Amino acid sequence: LFLLTSCTQQDAPQNQPKELLYVWLHDVGFEDPNFLAVINADSESENYGELVDTVPVFDTVGMAHHTPIFLPSSGLIYANDFHNSHTYIYETNNPLKPKLSKSFGKIKEYSFPHSYSELPNGNIISTFQTKGGINTVGGLVEFSPDGRYLRSSDAEIEGESIFLRPYGIVLVPKLNRIITTNYDMHETDNSFHIQIWDMKTLEQLHTIKLPKNEDMIIDQNPFEGRLLSDGETILFQTFSCGLYMLNSLDQNMPKISYVHHFAEGPFCSLPVRLGNYWIQTVASDMGGCNGGV
């Protein structure tokens, strides 16, 4: 995943880029350790687009996967190696020369971390797909900015056998809500639900099944969501290429409604919201994502 950051005048020496792009990567063949790449993202720089530095983890070979979408205010980047159920934290006090400051594996039996997001208080909230074993339901874990465990909350619903694997995170500070999607990275089964949590207490408030559309299998595996400009409404897509709207989050019965079907293709991956526009990646018939809508 990618993080874009700006360097202040104090941070950036003369002739150094004013904007940087951090990219968390693994190599194509999974033969070398994951690494964080620093790229010149200053469009006015003569070296725009060039690689500035790379910082490997010097650890086991794995799968570099998610980071926060935006650089946290602490300047600490959480980055996960999903295959190894591991989290790395980079500090960016010197934006041009990040340093690996900490790493950890399982937390209180929670394993396979996926997404990270900065809460309004500066702490980091993360989805963990499982707890206690690969065929279990995970939950939310909250960390201090520097990676200390603070608290957690299970996604499993007592007495109900709903398949859940917490995946993406959307924060709605205006309404004191956290929304999580559910998609199993190990692909043991399909999920059809999103969950809504109280941001202050991490109490699980709602588990809502996506509405089924006749003749279209697009309600499988809620994937990534984005908060809209009103600060209250969420659009999210499914891995099976459906687009849905979630609103009335502060009501007793939040509402999910079908919006659009992107493609007949095998899957739809990460979206980007730019102002009032939704840009959606769509897979080719051969597997990789090679287009957008």
Question: For each predicted feature, which ranges?
Answer:
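Beta-propeller fold detector
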Residues: 47-57, 97-106, 150-157, 204-212, ...
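Blade-loop segments of beta-propeller domains
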Residues: 48-118
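Asp-box/WD-like beta-propeller blade repeats and closely related beta-sheet repeat scaffolds
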Residues: 94-173, 182-184, 210
